[in-house]
Structure formats: C-alpha cells, structure tokens
Amino acid sequence: MVSKQPRKQRKARYNAPLHVRQKFMGARLSEALSKEYGTRSAAVIAGDTVKVMRGDYKGTEGKVQAVSLQDGTISVDGVISTKVDGTEVPRPIYPSNVMITKLELKDERRASSIKK
C-alpha cells in the first residue's frame, strides 16, 4: 500500500530511479496535437517544440535542448539567464509548466506509442 503522507510522497519522488523519473516528465499537448493523437499529454524529449505557459518566460516558444531526469527539468531555446560576468546559461523549467506544440517523432517507438 502506498502512503498518503506528503513527506513520504516527496521522499519517493526524490529517491526514484531514472526510469521512474521519466514518467514525471510529462507535459500537456496543444489542442491541435491533442485532437490529432487522441491524448492529452506526452513525455517531453529533446527536439520537441514547447511553449512556456507559466513563469517569467510565459509565452516563449522554443525547442527543447536538454532534458535532465536527475533534476526533473528541461532547457528550452530562448529561456536563458545572464550571469553577473555576462555569460548566458539556460534556465531550467519544469515540464509541467510547458505545452508541447510540435512533437519530435524520429524515434519510431515513441511515434507508435503516441499514435495508439
């Protein structure tokens, strides 16, 4: 039986192995994609085009450059922070705060699982 206690839920997420953390990387699909594929969400992978829906970068659209399962975040083109020394670094975003507008379907396995 799984506990309802928030501390144990947090601990389970924190200590989850990477193959389980992959399931936490889901994001909503745009209306057009949702109708086309008959599903509301999909896991975010590098190459997908996403639109930021929450936060300081709301409305920004760009390609996903990197996915970090360890941190549970993604890096998106155009979402950058400038450090004090002037260098630009990608600003990590949680996948729950983005909407997928274009899917990367080069992987046949992913394409078949989404088209089901």
UniProtKB/Swiss-Prot annotation:
Any one biological process term the GO annotation gives? translation
GO CC terms for this protein? large ribosomal subunit
Determine the domain of life of the protein's source: Archaea
Q: Which InterPro entries match?
A: KOW (IPR005824), Rib_uL2_dom2 (IPR014722), Ribosomal_uL24_CS (IPR005825), Ribosomal_uL24_euk/arc (IPR005756), Ribosomal_uL24_KOW (IPR041988), Translation_prot_SH3-like_sf (IPR008991)
**Stored HAMAP family:** Ribosomal_uL24_A (MF_01326_A)
The family note in this entry says: Belongs to the universal ribosomal protein uL24 family.
Q: What is this protein called?
A: Large ribosomal subunit protein uL24
